[in-house]
Regions:
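Glycine/serine-rich anion-binding loops at beta->alpha junctions
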Residues: 92-121, 139, 254-269
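Short, basic/glycine-rich phosphate-binding loops at helix/coil junctions
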Residues: 50-65, 113, 135, 216-227
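Conserved, helical-rich catalytic subdomain that frames metal- and/or nucleotide-binding sites
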Residues: 144-146, 151-255, 270-283, 288-306
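Conserved protein kinase catalytic domain
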Residues: 15, 33, 73, 114, ...
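ATP-binding N-lobe of GHMP and related small-molecule kinases
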Residues: 1-101, 118-131, 165, 174-178
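Contiguous, small/hydrophobic- and glycine-enriched helical/loop subdomains that border
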Residues: 88, 110, 114-151, 155
């Protein structure tokens, strides 16, 4: 039996703008993704038993759900069909990233499963096709094939890699008793419906692709500091998350913000020692001291798998 172990890193959004609701029921986004060192681990091994088995450690709720609903299972199943690979597979998912925290754990697991499965079977797949499969699993999944820092546009699924930033120390605080549904958070945001002419202007086509990319990258160059359009509506319904942000700033964070649609909140600290010291002030919550992680680690994973 062959076995592959692969990390699945979490992400934070350094900026997240909700431009409006599109005609296809999705929202038009502009966001800057950044991977952080907090991660889950996947172990994939070939098996003589037919089918795909998935065992989840570290998250009891996820382990009780039908395996076929899990993004890891769906990712491997899609790739198995694409490559027409026979034979069974055993997957172990060791969870550390809090579920439902806005840290991209499920999407990262799916991307890691795609890369790990390719490596396990020593297969290659055109990167464009791999992206298509990733998009079919979720809007955030393609980002985790790149890692580092990237601009996400459209639904967040069209990506433009950005230059990596210097390493920053991060403290993630995840409340144990607050869970935010992403669809609910979008409803709370009450984004305006984009007019059809606006939708056409925001949609990339062969005719406007170069201009569209230029405008998107100009947007990323203009923004500065942390910003998240989910904060106001989510904080209104969960005031404790606003308190966590305030407490992070009081504990020495230079900046703090809601992670994605929540419910985790993160702070940027001058050093790991200060982040660890601040973590002591959140005894009832899950805390993770980590750091931003460059694209290089992802680059090694992609080059090995493809």
């Amino acid at each position: 039996m062959r076995e592959v172990r692969i990390p699945a890193f979490a992400k934070i959004n350094l900026r997240l703008d909700i431009l409006g609701k599109r005609g296809d029921r999705y929202h038009e986004l502009r966001t800057i993704f950044q991977t952080i060192s907090l991660h889950d681990e996947l172990r994939l091994r070939t098996s003589r038993n037919p089918g795909i088995s998935l065992t989840i450690h570290g998250n009891e709720a996820l382990s009780r759900e039908p395996a076929s609903r899990n993004l890891v299972y769906r990712a491997v199943d899609a790739l198995k069909r694409e490559l027409k690979i026979r034979g069974g597979l055993e997957i172990e998912l060791h969870k550390t990233i809090p579920a439902g925290g806005g840290l991209g754990g499920g999407s990262s697991n799916a991307a890691a499963a795609l890369l790990g499965y390719l490596r396990l079977h020593r297969k290659r797949l055109a990167f464009e096709r791999l992206i298509e499969i990733a998009v079919s699993l979720g809007a955030d999944v393609p980002f985790f094939l790149f890692g580092g820092r990237a601009l996400g546009v459209n639904k967040g699924d069209e990506l433009y890699p950005l230059a990596d930033i210097p390493k920053h120390s991060i403290l993630v605080v995840a409340p144990r008793n607050i869970h935010v549904s992403t669809p609910e958070a979008f409803r709370w945001a009450q984004a305006p419906l984009l007019a059809s002419v606006q939708s056409r202007q925001l949609t990339k086509s062969p005719d406007n692709s170069k201009l569209w990319k230029f405008c998107a990258l100009c947007w990323s160059a203009q923004v500065g500091g942390l910003s998240n359009d989910f904060e106001r509506p989510v904080f209104r319904r969960h005031p404790r998350l606003a308190t966590l942000k305030r407490d992070l700033l009081r504990a020495g964070a230079t900046e703090a913000m809601l992670a994605g649609s929540g419910s985790a909140v993160f702070g940027v600290f001058p050093s790991p020692a200060l982040a660890r010291r601040a973590a002591v002030g959140f005894p009832s919550d899950q805390t993770f001291v980590c750091e931003t992680i460059s694209r290089e680690r992802y680059k090694r994973l992609v080059q090995t798998a493809l």
